[in-house]
């Protein structure tokens, strides 16, 4: 519940900043990167296995968000906006490590770490395929 509240707080912060800059939110659209990540793990299996798979995907999405926010925070000339992204980066890093910790807690660590590496390899292929298309997570 705490994570959900924190994420909603982030959404509000981003939305407020968008409005402050004179923009509006666009329509929600499907994220090809996320859809392709979800194709990696097979359907079925135990509830625990499916949960571990979802935790790994969520962890990867958070890790990539963290990387993007770090780059933005380091390159932006607007110090206020740079700090905004740095704060989000720290939070995303905590989420990423939390999801991996939970996956390792509920699944066999050796198997989870193997699946994590395989997911990273799969993601590299997704990134080659998607190229530099506009997206949130990809």
Task: List the predicted regions and their residue ranges.
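Non-heme di-metal
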Residues: 1-138
